């Protein structure tokens, strides 16, 4: 094992349930994230040599600093990872360790689930490696506790090898990335760096500086309920209005039909009765013009339906969530060029593709700190089929060390 504590550290982290809560109005959205920060991460950060380690109860960020040990390395670089996990069972995470994976099915604990190369051909990329999987009852939490473990391990390596020269390093572990609000209260003044990286990507080599632009759409449908036996020309079924609205959106512009730079409309929730219904969507696109056009389209559909109904029964609420960080980062590609150079020196092929999602870096970039995303190793994230390669995590640690030594 290249880094002695990496695996144990990761296993310790994922066993803590830090699932975020989209319905919470607190920061962090769940108390468990704060407990994780204060009782596990903070003491460990101090023990491995980070200085000025402090937790901000207003925004839920835990921050530490490792000062440069060579004054000629003048850049200041930050590394960021999120503490929360996605909206899937995270209680009693019981990881499996598969040494020297030789292909074939991996049975997930005593559950009826398995990782099957036919269903998940990405498994074939990991022959001979050590894989960490779930037991089939929870997610794993590699998104993004692999990132936290990698950052911690890199810092521990640097402080244990003081002869290795490095620049100023800032570390931040934040809450609620999975529910899209993690960076809302991020304080740039408390994280003075030239640029940063989120360690929140997937397979080996990922280096990303393009994200979706994102909006949340809530549509309320107001019906009129009368007895179905006498409903002719009187009833207005709110659920049917919701169906009609959905059918007016382009059927092929859904997540299951799109990839690459294609955007989409995604229905994430539908509840209601004849009297009132509510549909929740997310809207995603890369180009600003296309993103704005999607929002205009849903407004126009609502207006058209209301005109046909003769009254306002379709109510639209749109809220932008984050924007494509390419707009910021492409103005100064230093962070990308440095990461490419380090990866290539480590014989890692940079895989530069758009993120069909978002990271905390999306918002932080628009706050003035260019923050692209680097691989952390997770595969099949957000569910029971999630796994991560220990060797990919080790390579992520290599990249972090390479970045701060080359700055």
Swiss-Prot record:
Q: Where does Zn(2+) 1 bind?
A: 82, 143, 200
This molecule's function is given as: Cleaves the N-terminal amino acid of tripeptides.
- Give the record's cofactor note, including how many are bound: Binds 2 Zn(2+) ions per subunit.
What biological processes does GO assign it? peptide catabolic process; proteolysis
Binding sites annotated in the UniProt record for Zn(2+) 2: 143, 178, 382
Q: Which GO terms describe its molecular function?
A: metallopeptidase activity; tripeptide aminopeptidase activity; zinc ion binding
| Keyword set, alphabetical order | Aminopeptidase, Cytoplasm, Hydrolase, Metal-binding, Metalloprotease, Protease, Zinc
UniProt lists the family membership as follows: Belongs to the peptidase M20B family.
The protein, known as: Peptidase T
Q: What is its EC number?
A: 3.4.11.4
Q: Which residues form the active site?
A: 84, 177 (proton acceptor)
Localization per Swiss-Prot or TrEMBL: Cytoplasm
Please tell me the species this chain comes from.
Streptococcus pyogenes serotype M49 (strain NZ131)
Q: Which cofactor does it need?
A: Zn(2+)
Q: Which InterPro entries match?
A: ArgE/DapE_CS, Bact_exopeptidase_dim_dom, Peptidase_M20, Peptidase_M20_dimer, Peptidase_M20B
Q: Which Pfam families does the annotation name?
A: M20_dimer, Peptidase_M20
The answer to whether the entry has keyword Plastid is no
Membrane-crossing residues?
A: none
Record's catalysed reaction(s): Release of the N-terminal residue from a tripeptide
The entry's cellular-component GO terms read: cytosol
